[in-house]
Amino acid sequence: MSKLSRKQQTQKRHRRLRRHITGTSNRPRLAVFRSNNHIYAQLIDDAAQSTLCSASTVDKELRSGLKNNAGSCDASVAVGALVAKRAIAKGIEQVVFDRGGNLYHGRIKALADAAREAGLQF
């Protein structure tokens, strides 16, 4: 049996997590995707299969302020604050956090903490 790559391990964890985590219109799922260069966050209503709002380091609002640091913890903090601001503007205050199979530390934790500080509850 061959050893799984890091990406395969992440995908396996994500499939395992998604069995138990679902988002509704009242309490959507805050899904986080982390790549080497960027980080993406979206609020998803799984019942309606729709994205309610999203934010990422490729957004025009954040891109100019980040320069070449889109893969840093500071960028994750900015994305977390922006997605929380957009969610609260739509009347969403409670979410279910989906770390996307990634370990809860570093950039994922920074995004979650910033979203909590900006007013989201999870």
From Swiss-Prot:
Biased composition (Basic residues): 1-21
Keyword vocabulary terms for this entry: Ribonucleoprotein, Ribosomal protein, RNA-binding, rRNA-binding
Name of one Pfam family that matches: Ribosomal_L18p
Gene3D superfamilies per the UniProt record, alphabetical: 3.30.420.100
Recorded GO MF terms: 5S rRNA binding; structural constituent of ribosome
A GO BP entry: translation
Gene Ontology cellular-component annotations: cytosolic large ribosomal subunit
Region (Disordered): 1-25
UniProt-listed InterPro entries: Ribosomal_uL18_bac-type, Ribosomal_uL18_bac/euk
NCBIfam families: L18_bact (TIGR00060)
Role according to the record: This is one of the proteins that bind and probably mediate the attachment of the 5S RNA into the large ribosomal subunit, where it forms part of the central protuberance.
Subunit and interaction comment: Part of the 50S ribosomal subunit; part of the 5S rRNA/L5/L18/L25 subcomplex. Contacts the 5S and 23S rRNAs.
Family that this chain belongs to: Belongs to the universal ribosomal protein uL18 family.
Protein name: Large ribosomal subunit protein uL18
Gene that produces this protein: rplR
